[in-house]
Amino acid sequence: MTFVDSCVLIDIFNDDAQWKSWSIDQVSRALPRGLCINAVVYAEVSSSFATQHDVTTAIKHGRLDIKDIPMEAAYLAAEAFKRYRLNKGQFKTALPDFFIGAHAQVLSCPLLTRDPQRFATYFPDVQLITPTAAG
């Protein structure tokens, strides 16, 4: 199973000129092992669609399994946010990336993303599939 970050799906859904091809290729490579997202990713990609039905249809078409966020992941997200604040992070509430990274860690699955910095810093045990790592 591969956890897919919202930026990768937004590339595809919004026909991003720079990243759509890479994102489609990586999703296609990961598809045989299964793909998943959570409600946070669902919320972030929703702005690309006119209706909830459209979002859900696109998610189903992409064969993405929507996983509930377990309490263990919520706790890990909070712990990551505490470290972020200690590192002088400016945001006052937990960032979506913390819920995404923590969920991938709890599931012990790789995370497909174009934005590896925060994930690598706060979830170093999560294998990242990125433009640099993918080659």
What are these regions (language model features)?
Residues 1, 28, 101-135:
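Acidic, PIN/NYN-like endoribonuclease modules and their adjacent C-terminal/linker elements
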Residues 1-37, 47-58, 129, 135:
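Short, well-structured N-terminal submotif of metal-dependent ribonuclease cores
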Residues 2, 34-36, 63-68, 110:
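Short loop->beta-strand "edge-of-pocket" segments that line small-molecule binding or catalytic clefts
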Residues 8, 41, 73, 99-100, ...:
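Alpha-helix capping/helix-boundary segments
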Residues 12-16, 44, 87-91:
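Short, flexible loop segments at the rims of nucleotide/cofactor-binding pockets, characterized by
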Residues 50-72:
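Active-site-proximal, substrate-binding regions of enzyme catalytic domains
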Residues 65-114:
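Active-site neighborhoods of divalent-metal-dependent phosphate/nucleic-acid chemistry enzymes
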